[in-house]
Every structure is written in C-alpha cells, then in structure tokens.
Amino acid sequence: MSAEQNHGLEKDVGGPAAPAAAAPNAPAAAPGAPPAGMSAEEHRSRFGYGPLSHVNTKEAILPPFGGEFQPGLYKSVEARKFANPAPLGLSAFALTTFVLSCINMGARDITHPNIVIALAFGYGGLVQLLAGMWEMAVGNTFGATALSSYGGFWIAFAIVLTPGGFNIQTALTAENGDEAMFYNSFGLFLMGWFIFTTIMLFCTLRSTVAFFLLFLFLDLAFLLLGVGYIQRDDAGQPNPPVIKAGGFFGLLAAFAAWYNALAGIADSSNSFFIIPVAHFPWSPTGRARREKTERETV
C-alpha cells in the first residue's frame, strides 16, 4: 500500500494504522488516547468525528460540549458514579419554555398561561433544580449555576401565577385598581433574568454554536418579554407584538435546549448518528483545527 493510500485510510477510520506488533511489556494505550507526540486536543480536532466523536475517553481534558452543559475545557468524567444530568435539566427547561412560548405567541387563541403552572412547579422547576444539584455533584459549576437558577425561575414564575395563597397579583393590583403595578413588577422580574442570562451567555463564547445559540435565544426572549410588560399598549396591556416576538425567541430557545439535550444523550450505544455541535473557530477545538490546517498547507 502506498503512503498516499495509507494516509487516506487513516483519515477514513479516524486514526493512524496500528503497528504490526506491540512490544511484549509495553503498557496498553487507553481507548481513544492520542498517539505519542500528539496532544489530546489535536487528536480530537483531527479525528473527532463519526460515531464515537462524543464518547468520553480517558483524555485529561475534553473540549466544550453543550450536551454536558460544559462551556469550556473540562476534565473527563468517564469514571464518575453519576450519569450526565445535563440532558434532564435541558429537557425540563425546553418543554416548559416551549409551552409558555406557544401561549405567548397566541397559539390556538390561548390567552392565559395557567397550564404552565403545573409544568413550572413539577418539571421545569423541581426536576431542573434537581439536575442543577446533580451538576454540583459531578463538579460542573456552570451547569449547577445555570440549571439550578432556571429551575428557581420556573418555581418563582409558578408562584407568581398561582391564584389564592400567594396573593401576589391581587396585592399589586389592589392599590390603584388596575394591573399597571403588577405588569411593571413582572417586567422588572423578567429584566433581572435577562441580566443573569447575559452573564451566562458570556460564558458560552468559547464553547459550541449550539450551546451559544441556546443562551442567545433565551437572552432575547427575556429582554423582549420584559420590554413587552413595561412598555404596554394604549389599553395598558402587555404589548402584543413584543410579547409575540419574545415568545418566538423562547420557542427557538426551547428547540436549542432539546438539541443540546439530544447531543448529550445520543452516543454509539443508542443512536445511529451523532448530533453535530459545531465548535467556534476561536474555541480550543477550533484553534487546534486551524493550527492543523496551517501546518498541512505549509
């Protein structure tokens, strides 16, 4: 076999050809470990595609991955005792956000978001909060902060909308006899979450496109919804076009969350394909790929 054919075979199968015979006393290489003289990051950038591209190996450092809710380089967690909690938290966030965003967009002429209360307490709230706590157990600070916070958001959202016991909306409308104070308060509530989401967004700038888009869409949704409640229409109601725009970006955020969740769940053991996540050119993986291209073109 010629050198050119051998090089093509290496690119197709995702690694260099094995040596004819190993030394009797040589230690066995870890599965997926880079060959001698090649860093783990360069190995992943050159051969990190195909059915095993998202399978965690025993590399010391892994690249950013939204399926693990990791915006930066992180240590391999192959030997952890916990399963990956990120897809659970992402799915809880996605479903609750999807339903509320459809209502905000006026789907099926639904005008009251009361159905979201059950989801916000049970799935988007409690389950996502638990996923955030489990992210603490696996050592993911970003995932723990984000998932726990958005779980708290949904619980707080459900408390605001719950009639009766909490009496929040009634107390805010009792003073002037209209809902202006409640709408202003709720708008400030949403703007606070816009600020928090912007902080989280900054932490995804070196991660993947799919992970970044999740927080970008969510950030725009909070901003537009907050503006819609503060800058109301002539009738004193939340501005319908702005609320619908916020619902649209919320819908995009929900699908982006499901996409990242699927990327974290699908692997060679349960799927015939792997979800692409597209690393930014300035991310660690993107830089390694660019350096490889520059070396090959010299």
Swiss-Prot record:
Keywords: Cell membrane, Ion transport, Membrane, Transmembrane, Transmembrane helix, Transport, Vacuole. Residues 14-37 have a biased composition (Low complexity). InterPro entries: AceTr, Gpr1/Fun34/SatP-like, GPR1_FUN34_YAAH. Disruption phenotype: Leads to reduced growth when acetate is used as sole carbon source at low concentration and in a high pH medium. It is a multi-pass membrane protein. Induction: Expression is induced by ethanol and ethyl acetate and is mediated by the specific transcriptional activator of genes of the acetate utilization pathway facB. Expression is also induced by low concentrations of acetate or propionate and under the controle of the facB transcription activator. GO terms for cellular component: plasma membrane; vacuolar membrane. Residues 1-43 are annotated as: Disordered. Pfam families: Gpr1_Fun34_YaaH (PF01184). One of its GO terms (biological process) is plasma membrane acetate transport. Its main location: membrane. The chain crosses the membrane at residues 86-106, 115-135, 146-166, 185-205, 210-230, 245-265. One of its GO terms (molecular function) is acetate transmembrane transporter activity. It is found in: Cell membrane; Vacuole membrane. High affinity monocarboxylate transporter (MCT) involved in acetate uptake. Unlike other activities involved in acetate utilization, acpA is dispensable for growth on the acetate precursor ethanol. Belongs to the acetate uptake transporter (AceTr) (TC 2.A.96) family. This is Acetate permease A.
